[in-house]
Amino acid sequence: MATNGFRLVAVAGSVRSGNFSSKALALAVDEIRKRHVEVEVIDLARAHLSQPGLPPSEDALRIRKLVSEAAGVILATPEYHGSYSSVIKLFIENLGFPSGLAGKPVALLGVAAGQIGAIKALEHLRGVCAHVGAVVLPATVSVAGVQKLFDESGRCLDPATEKNIRGLATSLLDYLHNNVCPRAAMEEFVRSGSTEWMKHWAGSPDAARPSGTL
């Protein structure tokens, strides 16, 4: 399965050097690129985002454009004090209103040092993303005890964790393949002015049925 022609955006909600959110996200990004799909990784540590209520910065406008043009988004967050990071919240705030996430499939990845993982962070982040109109994928990945699962170079030491994170990436690609690609192809087909789709429909069994018989 390939989703060529689409671009995804990946965001890690931590600005700490060597943070585990970025290490986990890198596995998902690698899986996406293995499938020949372009993905733009937004480094929030290098972005100068605006505080809510202030005019958008140049970086905010650039990020809005990247997200608006993306087919889907992966958000990775650490769990801080029972919720997602303020960095991710500021990222979402800088996407404007209506949000750049509106109508887009979003995959969520959470990491935490504790035994229960980032369940609370993901629950809260799901609610916010849904509130701004994102299509949040049902499956999320919560990584518990993350400090034991990655080495300093970013290599994952646990095959099961790596499989789950890569699976999140493929879930997003599968969603795009099954739901976004066919719609985009049909829209392009219709915009081209071609009438071939009408001929195909006219030759189908459904075309011969009178209205009210379905």
Predicted regions mapped to residue ranges:
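N-terminal beta1-alpha1-beta2 submodule of the flavodoxin-like/Rossmannoid cofactor-binding fold
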Residues: 1-97, 160-173, 180-214
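Residue-level signal for beta-strand positions within conserved beta-sheet cores that form or flank
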Residues: 4, 35, 102, 137-139
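Glycine-rich NAD(P)-binding loop of Rossmann-like domains
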Residues: 5-7, 101-103, 151-157
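A broad detector of the eukaryotic-type serine/threonine protein kinase catalytic domain
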Residues: 13, 96, 106, 110-111, ...
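Short, glycine-/small-residue-rich phosphate/pyrophosphate-handling segment
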Residues: 30, 105-145, 156-163
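Mobile beta-alpha loop/short-helix "lid" or hinge segments that flank ligand
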Residues: 39-50, 97-99, 132-152, 179
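Short, charged/polar low-complexity linear motifs in solvent-exposed/disordered segments
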Residues: 120, 126, 154-155, 169-170, ...
